[in-house]
């Protein structure tokens, strides 16, 4: 950057989440303008827009569907002008079907806010009847915090409107009900793939000078969390999931299923903090990053690119969009979390289930059933499957070494943020091992598609990085292969294994494209 050699900013136009949220912004802008000009109505806060006023049959957000039926011509015209052609067909702009998801999102957010306000109002009333005026005042302030949030920022944080940066599936750790007054002023939001670790039941974090502890996941009345069974083959590490019983044998290698069949849930409504807060101390907050990313499906219509090196080594790239991934958080020791089906209370596995627990949001005893579950974030993104015919790829440790060498090389050589790309060693349906690289951005940012078309540059940069490091050949360090995210594989990563493969791939040339 200092010498003036830096890649120009790159923004893909085909990210469906960016496209959809811009469509939402056009529709809501037209709705707000119509309400102001024809009805003199103006909503500044979340409560104004999402809650029903006394004596009113509906909330303003519930009128959006009627305004968009049929979709006004000026809205359709604006969408046709600003969205790329592939997005028009994918979202259903021409026939107006795109509006259904907007209305569904608005209804979900309305239900969440209505439920939260009702819970705090109930607790405020109980405190008042118990002559706890201080506690009643705190719950009143919590209600004000929820209802007086600026509307546009609230819509962006709820994944309805676009915001700066690539879209993510954000969830919140709710703190307004806690005993610290700081909780009513905080908005602790994270990308769901990060939140399943940082906000998982039992995890701790420091914010606003207060130590918070997650007490469970947020349950919305009338809405059930998505759950699925899954297992990982102990032989080839092939991942399988389903809503019903899984096949008794691995579909990739045929090995009889000997790994545990677990269940995950997607905490899409967020998390709830323990009402009792603490003070930060000298001991770091407790947190567990035990888990992994798995490939559920590679998507469809993969474009193939074949590369060949002077040594005879070959590389096949199959790249495309809409690959489906699942990021799992399996708790300390990989034993999962105990979660209540009714109130969402949760905790890590400490050997036995507690005899009783308290609803973390309402503060009342709950007798709901408890289940052992993992936490998950599922999403679609751009994906690249890479098959290699090169020496030195006989073990999974060697595959992991090459994986992280290529990711670091692609980040340096193609000027891609390392946090925007990830990868796994993947056992395909035929049992063969390979690498899967993916964009960490839901919907895809086009990064791995660039890697597929410039694999030679990524390999060259990886070779320079690994070859120039000063650590021992039989080991690795944070200057070549190691990152905090691949800590579980640190002992398997070695520079010599990476150099063996990368040197055989040096000088790659494009052989065929399909």
Language-model features, listed with the residues they occupy:
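Short peripheral tails and domain-boundary helices/loops at the edges of structured domains
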Residues: 220-248
């Amino acid at each position: 950057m200092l010498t003036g050699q830096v890649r120009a900013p790159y923004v893909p136009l085909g990210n469906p989440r960016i496209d959809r949220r811009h469509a939402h912004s056009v529709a809501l802008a037209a709705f707000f303008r119509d309400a102001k000009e024809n009805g003199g109505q103006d909503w500044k806060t979340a409560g104004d827009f999402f809650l029903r006023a006394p004596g009113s049959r509906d909330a303003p957000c519930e009128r959006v569907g009627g305004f968009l039926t049929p979709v006004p011509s000026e809205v359709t015209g604006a969408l046709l002008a600003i969205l790329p052609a592939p997005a028009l067909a994918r979202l259903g702009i021409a026939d107006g079907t795109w509006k259904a998801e907007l209305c569904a999102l608005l209804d979900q957010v309305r239900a969440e806010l209505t439920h939260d306000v009702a819970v705090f109002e109930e607790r405020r009333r109980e405190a008042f009847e118990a002559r706890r005026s201080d506690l009643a005042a705190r719950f009143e302030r919590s209600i004000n915090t929820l209802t007086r949030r600026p509307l546009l920022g609230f819509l962006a944080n709820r994944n309805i409107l676009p915001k700066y940066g690539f879209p993510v599936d954000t969830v919140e750790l709710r703190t307004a009900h806690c005993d610290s007054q700081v909780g009513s002023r905080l908005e602790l939001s994270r990308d769901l793939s990060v939140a399943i670790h940082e906000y998982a039941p039992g995890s701790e974090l420091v914010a606003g000078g207060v130590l918070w502890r997650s007490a469970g996941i947020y349950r919305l009345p009338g809405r059930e969390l998505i759950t699925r069974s899954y297992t990982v083959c102990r032989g080839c590490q092939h991942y399988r999931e389903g809503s019903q019983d899984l096949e008794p044998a691995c579909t990739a290698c045929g090995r009889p299923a000997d790994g545990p069949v677990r269940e995950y849930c997607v905490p899409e409504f967020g998390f709830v903090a323990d009402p009792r807060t603490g003070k930060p101390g000298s001991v770091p907050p407790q947190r567990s990053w035990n888990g992994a990313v798995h490939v559920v499906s590679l998507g469809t219509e993969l474009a193939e690119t074949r590369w060949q090196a002077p040594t005879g080594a070959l590389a096949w790239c199959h790249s495309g969009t809409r690959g489906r991934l699942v990021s799992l958080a399996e708790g300390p020791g990989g034993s999962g979390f105990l979660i209540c089906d009714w109130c969402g209370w949760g905790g890590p596995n400490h050997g036995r289930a507690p005899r009783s627990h308290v609803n973390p949001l309402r503060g009342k005893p709950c007798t709901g059933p408890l289940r052992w579950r993992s936490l998950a974030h599922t999403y679609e993104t751009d994906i690249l499957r890479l098959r290699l015919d090169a020496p030195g790829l006989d073990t999974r440790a060697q595959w992991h070494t090459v994986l992280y060498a290529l990711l670091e090389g692609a980040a340096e050589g193609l000027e891609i943020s390392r946090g925007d790309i990830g990868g796994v060693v993947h056992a395909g349906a035929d049992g063969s091992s390979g690498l899967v690289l993916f964009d960490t951005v839901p919907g895809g940012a086009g990064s791995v598609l660039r890697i597929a078309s410039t694999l030679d540059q990524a390999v060259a940069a990886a070779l320079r990085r690994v070859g120039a490091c000063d650590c021992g050949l039989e080991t690795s360090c944070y200057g070549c292969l190691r990152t905090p995210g691949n800590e579980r594989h640190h002992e398997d990563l070695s520079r010599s294994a990476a150099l063996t493969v990368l040197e055989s791939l040096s000088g790659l040339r494009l052989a065929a494209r399909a």
